[in-house]
Amino acid sequence: MRNKLQQAKRIVIKVGTSSLIYPNGNINLKAIDQLAFTLSDLSNQGKEIILVSSGAIGVGLNKLNLSVRPTTIPEQQAVAAVGQAELMNIYNQRFSTYSQQMAQVLLTRDVIEYPESRNNVTNTFEQLLKMNIIPIVNENDTVAIEELDHLTKFGDNDQLSAIVCQIVQADLLVMLSDIDGFFSDNPTVNKEATLFSEINEINEDLFQLAGGKGSRFGTGGMSSKLKAAERVLANQQAMILANGKQPKIIFEILEGKDIGTLFIKGGHESD
């Protein structure tokens, strides 16, 4: 089944805050550089790459010398505004090193749910990919809000990456996190926890196994990743959950190596 990953042409890569920010709050420039190199190389191979990148608030905290994430919405959105600009500046520097053009795409949930604007977003993605430009996507944290009568947030970038995967009809979603894949238990607590190599169906039992929030600077936990996988499988697409500490692991994933957890419809096959 994993050999089919070698044939994936249109690929969405999602990187979490934990892959971009050290636990002490500093920006992991080495990881960002490695990510830019990897995605640029894949683009040169003829792959169509879309990057969904978290990290706006984490980078903003670093830029503003703040050690604690703000609690009020206006403060969080101000930090995100500062961080998004700085994050794109860093990406632009690193991708330029490898002569790869990139573009920023900021989305909110209402834009995707309204058919006309959703169609415009899809057309923009198609045009960027046609021009061999890597779109870098994030939720527009500066304006997105979550209210009962006006819901504009996706929830987190795990959901956003699955939605992007859906609207561009990608072959594969590669979700890079701070964990090696989906385990039978929390591997940081239980050393006997086993890694699922392949999951074909998302059920309540799996959600029971998933628990806890994400990193101090991010929002997504394992339940969020399961929800994203559920959306991906519903659209007959595939998703890999793997550790993003070394972004070049994407090369090995696309070679079909047994890395992380593969979420895909159907059972085990000889291929």
From Swiss-Prot:
Recorded superkingdom: Bacteria
Q: Which InterPro entries match?
A: AceGlu_kinase-like_sf (IPR036393), Asp/Glu/Uridylate_kinase (IPR001048), G5K_ProB (IPR041739), Glu/AcGlu_kinase (IPR001057), Glu_5kinase (IPR011529), Glu_5kinase/COase_Synthase (IPR005715), Glutamate_5-kinase_CS (IPR019797)
The first-level EC class reads transferase
Q: In which pathway does it act?
A: Amino-acid biosynthesis; L-proline biosynthesis; L-glutamate 5-semialdehyde from L-glutamate: step 1/2
Q: Which residues of the sequence carry a binding annotation for substrate?
A: S54, D141, N157
* Any one Gene Ontology molecular-function term assigned to this protein's record: glutamate 5-kinase activity
Which PROSITE patterns does this UniProt record tie to the protein? GLUTAMATE_5_KINASE
List locations, semicolon-separated: Cytoplasm
Residues binding ATP are K14, S177, D178, T219, G220, G221, M222, S223, S224, K225
User: What EC number(s) does its UniProt record assign?
Assistant: 2.7.2.11
- Example GO BP: L-proline biosynthetic process
What reaction is this protein's catalytic activity?
A: L-glutamate + ATP = L-glutamyl 5-phosphate + ADP
Q: Entry's SUPFAM superfamilies?
A: Carbamate kinase-like (SSF53633)
| Purpose of the protein | Catalyzes the transfer of a phosphate group to glutamate to form L-glutamate 5-phosphate.
Which PANTHER family does this UniProt record tie to the protein? GLUTAMATE 5-KINASE (PTHR43654), ISOPENTENYL PHOSPHATE KINASE (PTHR43654:SF1)
Question: What is the protein name given in its UniProt record?
Answer: Glutamate 5-kinase
Annotated source species: Enterococcus faecalis (strain ATCC 700802 / V583)
